[in-house]
């Protein structure tokens, strides 16, 4: 082998040693794992071993490492189940998972299409519920009735007073017919009052001051101007009725006395 080849091989070996030394200097030793160790303690011990600074010396011959500190027992911390069953822990983990989840690159067309589909489904669902309510309660007109605007008490429409229709003026023929009808009613009432007058003995032959429809009224009016009106006749009729009631009571008392006398004498009634 030539001297040039030996020199190249020596340089290659030196380079390999340098690479290995650099690799060993940047590597971090892990604590030994024992089979009897708890997995939670092993995880925490590894975390502490990686986080604690380690003094290292690199050389071509040997590597010296400082021993990690004694592992801390975390069994007492993790024995409680409430740490992992807390709602805040669950909600925070869900938020972190949502934040770390990859975003979907949805296009605007697909989003618009999805929104249209959701709107159509909501409309169909609402219509189905409305139809079900109408069928169950028979309130179709009530459900579809538009809300009416409520008027405030202060804004009530002023009610206009109703105007009476103007009276039509009667013609001459209508006036004559109306007067004849009223005269007939008046004469009928006067005749009834005149009949009461004839029942009363002390005014039966007196003349009346009102028209009764008799033929000799004009002749009697010329002979005697003093006449009885309707109020006077009604007053006399009331006095006469009271007089008759009093006489009836007297007759009843006298009749009772006569019956008692007949019974005393041994007669029969």
UniProtKB/Swiss-Prot annotation:
Domain of life: Eukaryota
Keyword DNA damage: no
Comp. bias intervals (Basic and acidic residues): 169-178
Induction text: Expression is controlled by RTG1 and is down-regulated during mating process, yeast-to-hyphal transition, and in presence of benomyl, amphotericin B, and caspofungin.
CDD domains cross-referenced by the UniProt entry: bHLHzip_SREBP_like
Region (Disordered): 146-178
Extent of Basic residues compositional bias: 159-168
bHLH domain sequence ranges: 173-244
Localization annotation: Nucleus
Keywords associated with the record: Carbohydrate metabolism, Nucleus, Transcription, Transcription regulation, Virulence
A single Gene Ontology CC term: nucleus
Pfam families: HLH
GO MF: DNA-binding transcription activator activity; DNA-binding transcription factor activity; protein dimerization activity; RNA polymerase II cis-regulatory region sequence-specific DNA binding; sequence-specific DNA binding
Any single biological process term in GO: positive regulation of glycolytic process
PANTHER family named among the record's database cross-references: SERINE-RICH PROTEIN TYE7, TRANSCRIPTION FACTOR HMS1-RELATED
Assembly and interaction partners: Efficient DNA binding requires dimerization with another bHLH protein.
Protein's job: Key transcriptional regulator of carbohydrate metabolism. Binds the promoter sequences of the glycolytic genes at the CANNTG motif and activates their expression during growth on either fermentable or non-fermentable carbon sources as well as under hypoxic growth conditions. Complete glycolytic activation by GAL4 and TYE7 is required for full virulence. Involved in biofilm formation and negatively regulates hyphal formation under hypoxia. Also controls the expression of the copper transport protein CTR1.
This protein's name: Carbohydrate metabolism regulator TYE7
Organism: Candida albicans (strain SC5314 / ATCC MYA-2876)
């Amino acid at each position: 082998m030539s001297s040039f080849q030996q020199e190249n091989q020596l340089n290659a070996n030196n380079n390999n040693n340098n690479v290995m030394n650099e690799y060993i200097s940047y590597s971090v030793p892990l604590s030994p794992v024992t089979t009897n160790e708890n997995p939670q303690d092993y995880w925490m011990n590894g975390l502490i071993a990686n986080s604690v600074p380690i003094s290292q010396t690199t050389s071509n011959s040997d590597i010296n490492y400082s021993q990690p500190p004694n592992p801390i027992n975390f069994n007492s911390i993790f024995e409680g189940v409430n740490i992992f069953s807390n709602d805040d822990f669950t909600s925070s983990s869900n938020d972190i998972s949502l934040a770390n989840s990859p975003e979907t690159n949805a296009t605007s067309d697909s989003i618009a299409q999805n929104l249209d589909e959701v709107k159509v489904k909501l409309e169909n669902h609402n219509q189905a519920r409305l139809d079900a309510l109408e069928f169950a309660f028979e309130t179709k007109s009530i459900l579809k009735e538009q809300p009416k605007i409520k008027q405030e008490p202060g804004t009530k429409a002023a009610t206009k007073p109703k105007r009476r229709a103007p009276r039509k003026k009667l013609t001459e023929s209508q006036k004559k017919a109306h007067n004849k009808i009223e005269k007939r009613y008046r004469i009928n009432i006067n005749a009834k009052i005149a009949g009461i007058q004839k029942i009363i003995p002390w005014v039966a032959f007196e003349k009346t001051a009102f028209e009764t429809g008799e033929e000799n009224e004009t002749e009697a009016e010329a002979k005697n101007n003093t006449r009885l009106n309707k109020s006077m006749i009604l007053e006399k009729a009331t006095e006469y009725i009271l007089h008759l009631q009093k006489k009836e009571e007297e007759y009843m008392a006298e009749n009772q006395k006569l019956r008692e006398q007949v019974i005393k004498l041994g007669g029969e009634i």
